[in-house]
């Protein structure tokens, strides 16, 4: 088990790819030549992303070999886990999976002074925080879906908490545009509650690594409608949802240009 952070990870750009729908934005990013120093995968993505650098499977892997608790993932994980070459961080070693490494739970909690980690994605984010990476790009970490308002997976708050800790430490955080993490998939005009009800809402967005705050009309005047990683070159428009869960089709995005 690691006792200290990995020096080689300090300042690196890392993609964390989980199993939600916004994993598609990772594939789009790779298609459009975006590069990462390391790619970390969550659970079943270990059988989807070729040659990941690290994996996080925080449940004991015995559940894949000795039960069907993982549902449809079971057969694939049983087949893939023994063949993986990269480190797989987990809570318990198992001879059937040679690549397993114990997650550095004690040194990480002591260094970050936080023991609030309630899902596997949060463990990966905490690992990035502990290792002082330079940038995190989140894909597939989707805990609720607009198409099913009565279903939500546990863990979104914990992930957002750890992302905030990362940002406080100067780590750049980017979220896939299809993900609801940090409200990434909410229309720009609806992100600031209360102001979203105004005829010309106040918005905030990132430009030249600095947060800008202005009226939405000012963005339109400057032809500065921000765009995300995916859908920049797609023929199919992205569907966005406002705070009332009403779908709206965004107009064709344009590349930002300086005034």
Language-model features: where?
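Metal-ion/cofactor- or nucleotide/acyl-coenzyme-handling active-site neighborhoods
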Residues: 1-259
């Amino acid at each position: 088990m690691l006792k200290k952070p990995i020096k080689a990870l300090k300042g690196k750009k890392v993609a964390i790819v989980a199993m939600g729908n916004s994993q598609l934005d990772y594939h789009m990013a790779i298609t459009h030549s975006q590069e990462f120093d390391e790619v970390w995968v969550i659970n079943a993505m270990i059988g989807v992303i070729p040659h990941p650098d690290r994996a996080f499977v925080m449940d004991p892997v015995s559940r894949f070999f000795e039960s069907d608790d993982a549902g449809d993932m079971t057969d694939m994980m049983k087949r893939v886990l023994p063949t993986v070459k990269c480190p797989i961080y987990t809570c318990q070693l198992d001879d059937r999976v040679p690549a397993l490494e114990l997650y550095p739970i004690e040194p990480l909690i002591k260094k970050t002074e936080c023991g609030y980690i309630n899902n596997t994605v949060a463990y990966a984010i905490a690992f990035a925080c502990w290792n002082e990476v330079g940038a995190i790009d989140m894909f597939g970490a989707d805990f609720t879906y607009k198409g099913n308002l009565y279903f939500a997976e546990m863990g979104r708050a914990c992930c957002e908490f750890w992302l905030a800790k990362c940002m406080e430490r100067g780590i750049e955080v980017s979220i896939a545009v299809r993900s609801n993490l940090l409200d990434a998939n909410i229309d720009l005009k609806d992100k600031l509650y209360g102001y979203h009800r105004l005829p010309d809402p106040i918005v905030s967005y990132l430009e030249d690594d600095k947060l800008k705050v202005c009226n939405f009309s000012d963005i339109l005047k400057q032809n500065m409608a921000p765009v995300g990683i995916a859908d920049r070159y797609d023929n199919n428009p992205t569907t966005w949802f406002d705070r009332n869960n009403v779908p709206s089709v965004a107009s064709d995005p344009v590349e930002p240009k300086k005034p």
